[in-house]
Amino acid sequence: MLHGYLSNKESFAPQIEYFSKFYRVTAPDFPGMGGANALGCPFSVSDYADWTERFLEEQGIKNPLVIAHSFGGRVAVKLLARGRVDKAVLTGCAGIVRKRTLRYKMKVRAYRIVKKLAPKYAEKHFGSAEYRTLSPVMRESYKKIVNEDLREEAKTIERPVLFVCGTEDRETPLSSAQIYHACVKDSRLLVLEKCGHFAHIENPLAFNAAAEEFFS
């Protein structure tokens, strides 16, 4: 199980409890997150995928069934494209860069101007609250991650994938899941009503049942 950005394996508590009845469940914390060691240098999505491959090899795991959320979905897309995964359930899967609005572009331009004149002010008042809490290394990693669009890699995936999206998800909206679904030829799309970005936690019964059926 591959967790979301700045999250940890505990975010999969309902899935770990449920699937441990049927499978050997492994849920690592990504480097720089949860209880893992801090990053020594900025990681890209590919770097995290490389790390995950090494982790799987160390654990003696081949062709795993994967459940991934948000950022973990980015890593899973890389692994799927490399043929390292048997099947995957990706919920709230990130990796589709949305078209930038005029407002966003103006905000970026303003940030660049203010950063030159008053860097401390820019750091305090621009960017998401999440971004402002990151260490310098994690900030550089974050930039690498969020600016990479994974559509082309998704098109190369030949393994079965179930995409799950909540109707109220604002972080990775249904439109992103639909794009992924169109890119991956052997894929399904499950939409969970009245769920947001954490559909696997908000409706674990429906999510677990769908994942179990998909994996069987």
Map each language-model feature to its residues:
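Flexible "cap/lid" loop of the alpha/beta hydrolase fold
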Residues: 74-117
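Conserved alpha/beta-hydrolase "acid-adjacent" motif
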Residues: 170-176
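Catalytic histidine-centered segment of alpha/beta-hydrolase-like enzymes
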Residues: 195-208
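Catalytic histidine neighborhood in serine/cysteine hydrolases
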Residues: 181-198
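Active-site loop/oxyanion-hole signature of alpha/beta-hydrolase fold enzymes
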Residues: 13, 26-67, 209
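Conserved alpha/beta-hydrolase catalytic His-Asp/Glu region
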Residues: 100-159
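Short beta-strand/loop motif that positions the catalytic acidic residue
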Residues: 156-157, 163-165, 169
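Conserved HGGG/HGGXW glycine-rich cap/lid loop of the alpha/beta-hydrolase fold
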Residues: 1-35
